[in-house]
Amino acid sequence: VVYQINEVIAIYPITPSSPMAEWADAWASEGKPNIWGTVPTVVQMQSEGGVAGAVHGALQTGSLTTTFTA
């Protein structure tokens, strides 16, 4: 559901975590569209702080945004 209703997905691979970040990255790479017919932008960051900044920036522009990290 989360992949389907977002435009920007910021991920930071960390252990342990849910497999959702990997799935979102794979779906976006395959060109799987969300409910609006666009492919969400998936960005992999280098830290959890980077994810927080990316999410904040995306939300400030009005994008529907989520993150998958610890």
From Swiss-Prot:
Assigned EC number: 1.2.7.-
Short name of any one Pfam family annotated for the protein: POR_N
Reactions it catalyzes: oxidized [flavodoxin] + pyruvate + CoA + 2 H(+) = reduced [flavodoxin] + acetyl-CoA + CO2
Single GO biological process annotation from the record: response to oxidative stress
GO molecular function: 4 iron, 4 sulfur cluster binding; metal ion binding; pyruvate-flavodoxin oxidoreductase activity
Keyword NAD among UniProt keywords: no
Enzyme class: oxidoreductase
Keywords, comma-separated and alphabetical: 4Fe-4S, Electron transport, Iron, Iron-sulfur, Metal-binding, Nitrogen fixation, Oxidoreductase, Repeat, Transport
Family under the similarity heading: Belongs to the pyruvate:ferredoxin/flavodoxin oxidoreductase family.
Protein role: Oxidoreductase required for the transfer of electrons from pyruvate to flavodoxin, which reduces nitrogenase.
Protein name (Swiss-Prot/TrEMBL): Pyruvate-flavodoxin oxidoreductase
Origin species: Anabaena variabilis
